[in-house]
Design a protein with these regions (language model features):
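N-terminal cationic leader/targeting segments used for protein routing and processing
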Residues: 4-6, 28, 418
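Intrinsically disordered, low-complexity sequence elements enriched in Ser/Thr/Gly/Pro
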Residues: 2-3, 25, 404, 408
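Bacterial N-terminal signal peptides that target proteins for export
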Residues: 1-11
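Bacterial Sec-dependent N-terminal signal peptides
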Residues: 19-34
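Glycan-processing catalytic domains of CAZymes
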Residues: 30-401, 405-438
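Bacterial N-terminal signal peptides
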Residues: 10-21
């Protein structure tokens, strides 16, 4: 494992190089002739865990919610059965991409399914293991080699592992680095670093945000950047007293998770769960488990957010993450945030702004596109149940306009003397592109 001093040095060098290129772009060059435009040729992955009932109508309903992918388990049909093959056919018919679950999790044994799933057009990924312990990595290397041999001369088939958020029984840094260094080079094609932290905590009327969330987002963001991997994070759409996760009360609880994750550059998401979980004591999900095509309250909320993201995902995905700046709000009576203090690689300033302040605790993710334009994900970090608006104030170095994507819609704001104030509702985030026009 790289020791922490070397790790920090590498991370700093990456950001220093980025900063140098940005400073050139940010200096006054007379301004742009027009606002930057982005080709609508990129799509955010929005998946769902726990497959629905095995009817065409149920899979069409998943697609209509805005899902691009669905994890296929064996709750309703065992692998190899005609019912299972029918499910893959349903996915193909409605335009959903299937992620085949191999069933291995934590410290279980190596899965034995050797089916060639490339013959099923809907199958896009193979999920070989969920939250493996670090002592399973040798088995996962075997799976990676077998996957590469099976699919390398056929069509693209993504090798997928969902990592344990607590470090697989070891040090989290070592766990993630070992995966990136020793396992992912064994496979070709799309490479994804995935994990899950379910941040909305509480029971018996109390509520809080998990302190484990931001450190894991930061860790994955740093390694994904270093190893040129995409990120994937699960969104909490379930609750259980068994796990200390609270109920999802409104659309704000879902939107909040997306924008906090996006402040750390996450490009792909999945709902845990899409279907009401079969695990005893778990609530939530977007559809019921035992009744065909029956929505829960979360379905419409998720559908709205998915549509919101789809309106500007091609813009967001045209930018690369270059760090995150946490801001303690001026109205925070403690003057500090323990979640922010646990972070190791936070930015202390933005490249495109002389100053930024906020009334509430805020995250600002810093991004750059291929032409050197700056982008910022700005997120109200307060728990949505606190019902607190946040006013974020920027003093940009070189901007007279700002493109602000709010609710998925692009709005143009005038930036006077470099200053822009943005009010964020509870759970809200926006994507900001500061621009100087001639």
């Amino acid at each position: 494992m790289m020791n922490k001093k070397i790790f920090s040095l590498v991370f700093s060098m990456v950001f220093a190089a980025t900063s140098a290129s940005c400073l050139t772009a940010c200096k006054d060059s007379g301004g742009l002739d027009a606002f930057p435009e982005y080709a609508d040729d990129k799509q955010m992955m929005i998946g769902g865990w726990d497959s629905p009932m095995n009817t065409l109508e149920d899979y069409r309903m998943a697609k209509e919610m805005g899902l691009t992918h669905i994890f296929i388990d064996e709750y309703f049909a065992p692998k190899g059965s005609q019912d299972y093959k029918d499910i893959l056919g349903f996915c193909e018919e409605v335009g959903l991409k299937a992620i085949v679950n191999m069933g291995a999790s934590v410290d279980s044994e190596k899965p034995t399914d050797t089916t060639d799933y490339s013959i099923y057009p809907a199958v896009d990924m193979i999920n070989y293991w969920d939250e493996p312990t670090i002592d399973r990595f040798e088995l996962i290397k075997e799976l990676a080699n077998e996957h590469e041999a099976r699919y390398k001369d056929k069509r693209d088939m993504t090798f997928y592992i969902n990592m344990d958020p607590s470090g697989g029984g070891g040090d989290p840094d070592e766990y993630v680095r070992t995966f990136c260094e020793e396992i992912m080079p064994l496979v070709s094609g799309r490479k994804i670093l995935s994990t899950d932290v379910y941040p909305l905590s509480g029971k018996n009327g109390a509520h809080s945000v998990s302190s484990a969330w931001l450190p894991r987002l930061e860790l994955n963001a740093v390694y994904a950047k270093e190893f040129d991997m995409e990120q994937h994070f699960f969104v909490q759409s379930y609750w259980s007293n068994l796990t200390g996760t609270r109920e999802i009360y409104s659309i704000d609880d879902l939107r909040y998770q997306f924008y906090v994750d996006m402040a750390y550059g996450v490009q792909n998401f999945s709902y845990f769960t899409y279907t009401h979980s079969f695990i005893e004591g778990f609530g939530g999900g977007c559809v019921e488990r035992e009744v065909s095509c029956k929505k829960t309250a979360l379905y419409d909320w998720a559908q709205e957010i998915n549509a919101e993201l789809a309106k500007f995902d091609h813009v967001y995905l045209s930018f690369d993450w270059n760090g995150t700046m946490p801001i303690v709000g001026t109205d925070n009576p403690d003057g500090e945030n323990a979640h922010f203090m646990a972070l190791k690689h936070s930015l202390t300033a933005l490249e495109c702004a002389n100053k930024v302040t906020a009334t509430q605790d805020t995250l600002v993710g810093q991004f750059k596109d291929a032409d050197g334009n700056d982008g910022l994900i700005v997120t109200n970090y307060t728990d949505p149940l606190d019902l607190v608006d946040d006013v974020v104030s920027f003093e940009f170095k070189n901007a007279n306009r700002a493109l602000v994507y709010r609710g998925g819609e692009r709005k143009i704001y005038e930036v006077k003397n470099g200053k822009l104030d943005i009010r964020l509702a509870p759970g809200e985030g926006v994507f900001v592109i500061p621009v100087k026009l001639k």
